[in-house]
Amino acid sequence: MKIIIQRVKKAQVSIEGQIQGKINQGLLLLVGVGPEDQEEDLDYAVRKLVNMRIFSDAEGKMNLSVKDIEGEILSISQFTLFADTKKGNRPAFTGAAKPDMASDFYDAFNQKLAQEVPVQTGIFGADMQVELVNNGPVTIILDTKKR
């Protein structure tokens, strides 16, 4: 899995002009699933995401997790994180998991996350418009194959 983590003051995702998911303070996740991803990748990602201390404490130090601040997560599927840009000018996406596998894996990921913190999502495979107000900005890349 490859996940772009953005600390946000608020974020929302819309599909065809209708709001699909909306959060206040928390994390916006862009989630890519790879063909080799297993349940251990999912468990690792969830554990890291809910416990990662990237929110400021009273002294301004990044010392609090999304769980600590009672924040929320907006999770967006993003197969383009597996883009291969080595040849030509058009990215290839053959490094991403096949849609059926990726959809099931993404759903399982969101269900596990929701056991820890409130989660809103987009719709897998839909054309989505994402709006966010970055907080910091703080942007972190999590790759479950690099641990």
Curated annotation (Swiss-Prot):
InterPro entries: Daa-tRNA_deacyls_DTD, DTD-like_sf
Keywords: Cytoplasm, Hydrolase, RNA-binding, tRNA-binding
Signal peptide: none
Catalytic activity: glycyl-tRNA(Ala) + H2O = tRNA(Ala) + glycine + H(+); a D-aminoacyl-tRNA + H2O = a tRNA + a D-alpha-amino acid + H(+)
Transmembrane segments: none
GO biological process: D-amino acid catabolic process; tRNA metabolic process
Short sequence motif Gly-cisPro motif, important for rejection of L-amino acids: positions: 136-137
Taxonomy, superkingdom: Bacteria
GO MF terms held by the record: D-tyrosyl-tRNA(Tyr) deacylase activity; Gly-tRNA(Ala) deacylase activity; Ser(Gly)-tRNA(Ala) hydrolase activity; tRNA binding
Enzyme Commission number(s): 3.1.1.96
Subcellular locations according to the entry: Cytoplasm
Gene Ontology cellular-component terms listed: cytoplasm
CDD domains the record matches: Dtyr_deacylase (cd00563)
Main function: An aminoacyl-tRNA editing enzyme that deacylates mischarged D-aminoacyl-tRNAs. Also deacylates mischarged glycyl-tRNA(Ala), protecting cells against glycine mischarging by AlaRS. Acts via tRNA-based rather than protein-based catalysis; rejects L-amino acids rather than detecting D-amino acids in the active site. By recycling D-aminoacyl-tRNA to D-amino acids and free tRNA molecules, this enzyme counteracts the toxicity associated with the formation of D-aminoacyl-tRNA entities in vivo and helps enforce protein L-homochirality.
Subunit structure: Homodimer.
Family: Belongs to the DTD family.
UniProt-listed PANTHER family: D-AMINOACYL-TRNA DEACYLASE 1 (PTHR10472:SF5), D-TYROSYL-TRNA TYR DEACYLASE (PTHR10472)
Domain notes: A Gly-cisPro motif from one monomer fits into the active site of the other monomer to allow specific chiral rejection of L-amino acids.
Protein name, per record: D-aminoacyl-tRNA deacylase
The species this protein was found in: Streptococcus pneumoniae (strain ATCC BAA-255 / R6)
